[in-house]
A protein has these predicted regions:
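Transmembrane alpha-helices of multi-pass inner-membrane enzymes
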Residues: 42-46, 344, 370-419
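Hydrophobic transmembrane alpha-helices and their immediate junctions
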Residues: 332-375
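Transmembrane signal-anchor hairpin modules in multi-pass inner-membrane enzymes, especially those
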Residues: 1-84, 88, 102-122, 168-181, ...
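Alpha-helical transmembrane segments of multi-pass inner-membrane proteins
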Residues: 24, 102-106, 110-142, 149-219, ...
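Long extracytoplasmic/lumenal interhelical loops at the membrane interface
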Residues: 264-278, 290-333
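Membrane-interface micro-motifs in multi-pass membrane enzymes
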Residues: 31-38, 93-97, 147-161, 199-201, ...
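Transmembrane-embedded, aromatic-rich helix segments that form part
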Residues: 36-41, 200-212, 337-342
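A membrane-periplasm/extracellular boundary helix in multi-pass inner-membrane enzymes
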Residues: 196, 217-263, 278-286, 294
């Protein structure tokens, strides 16, 4: 009987480790792969809840989780409140929103499994970044991407996976040389694929990642180190600008967009985004409590174009998205939406920040990974509705749940956070 019990728990841990190993790669390689892995992990969590393996601990509530749980349900609640006000109960907005609260059972499962389950992530992040790099092709204008994702999402996913690869070095102790090389290659592949995609909005996160690295990884910052770092950064940018035709082209396009915008041409990529941001603020100021509905921003475009507030081209593109996650939720669901999307970022960010104060090096490093991950998605969402895609919402909520579960794992031998 004991052998059967042991096999059940072992099977659960092996299944969870396998899903953690493959989910980043399936995001690129298989359309719907991320949602498929999410569903399988959720089913595994439900199975364990229904029939808990003997020897596996029950869930022990910690008061820090309350903010995280509320944040994961906030978007769905904001959507429902806005829909009640507008008497429009379309189910579509709840699709992506459901991924947040459905990640809670995943968190509760993983935080009770042994830590070696999470070791799979050390391979998952770099392998996915390298896979995406190898799958990339040049479909339009020399910008590289894949068929299962648009260029912006592809470039941003590659960048975050590359950064996670770099930040995971020595995560569970000193890495062996082959694993360290794999992680460095993952970082290089992710950065190269992001640059080749031309997703310049995501590049805004690079200074943030550098700041996180220096804050947590460098114990002593001298004036000499700062000077050397600045010179190195300028040199690196110059080399990339000269060597990468895509990077060169996208930077020149941005400069041209700004110059022509000052001359009155608002229908550039940058100009249209700026118009839509102002339009979203305008909508929010007129509907501050409940917004215009989760998908009501599109209906505001024609009246605003007729009033001369935005150009017809901006209105046409605005029917698709606002190009900003925060402004989109604020315009669509008012104050409830604004608070909900901020909670999606800052509730887990706060827990990861607390994790960096832990007595355990593993928890500290996991907290740093979480901070880098959430910060990256926050910046990505400033120039595109990154979390509007169901698979992107699934990837974000799933990864946050996984990293938080590693932080709060019951098998750590040291107290989680210093008092």
């Amino acid at each position: 009987m004991g052998m059967v019990q042991s096999r059940y728990l072992s099977l659960v841990e092996k299944a969870a480790a396998l899903l953690l190993l493959i989910y980043p790669t399936l995001t690129f390689a298989v359309k719907g792969g991320m949602n498929g892995v999410f569903l399988l992990m959720l089913l595994l969590a439900i199975a364990v809840w229904a029939v808990r393996p003997p020897g596996m601990n029950t869930v022990k509530w910690q008061h820090e989780w309350k903010a995280y749980f509320l944040a994961m349900g906030a978007i769905a609640a904001a959507i429902f409140i806005s829909q009640i006000y507008h008497q429009n109960y379309d189910a579509h907005p709840h699709d992506a929103a459901s991924r947040y609260w459905l990640a809670i059972p995943v968190f509760l499962l993983l935080q009770r499994l042994r830590l070696n389950v999470f070791a799979a992530l050390q391979f998952a992040f770099p392998v996915a970044a390298i896979t995406g790099f190898l799958l990339a092709r040049n479909p339009v204008g020399g910008r590289s991407g894949i068929g299962t994702l648009d260029l912006i999402h592809f470039g941003n996913f590659e960048l975050i996976l590359g950064v996670l690869s770099l930040f995971s070095i020595d995560w569970f102790g000193r890495d062996h040389l082959p694993l360290r090389i794999l992680k460095i290659l993952g970082f290089a592949a992710g950065l190269a694929a992001s640059l080749a995609s031309g997703s310049r909005g995501g590049w805004l996160a690079i200074p943030v990642f550098i700041a996180i690295f220096f804050y947590f990884k460098v114990t002593r910052v001298s004036l000499k180190m700062v000077a050397v770092s600045l010179v190195s950064a300028i040199l690196a940018i110059t080399i990339v600008y000269s060597a990468s035709s895509t990077f060169h082209q996208r930077v020149n396009e941005l400069a041209n967009d700004v110059a022509t915008f000052d001359q009155g041409n608002r229908d550039t990529s940058t100009g249209i985004r700026w118009q839509l941001y102002k339009a979203a603020v305008d909508v929010f100021m007129r509907h501050p409590v409940f917004g215009v509905g989760p998908e009501g921003f599109a209906a505001e475009m024609k009246p605003m174009a007729d009033a001369g507030k935005i150009t017809p081209k901006a209105a046409e593109l605005g029917r698709g998205e606002v190009h900003n996650d925060i402004l989109s939720k604020a315009a669509g669901m008012g104050m409830f939406g604004l608070l909900a999307i901020l909670a999606i970022y800052f509730a887990p960010l706060n827990l990861f920040w607390r994790a960096t104060r832990s007595a355990s090096e593993k928890i500290k490093r996991t907290g740093i990974l979480g901070i880098a991950f959430v910060s990256g998605f926050f910046v990505f969402g400033l120039t595109v509705e990154f979390l509007n895609l169901t698979m992107a919402a699934a990837f974000y909520s799933f990864t946050v749940a996984v990293l938080l579960a590693a932080c709060y794992n019951i098998h750590h031998g040291e107290p989680f956070i210093k008092p």
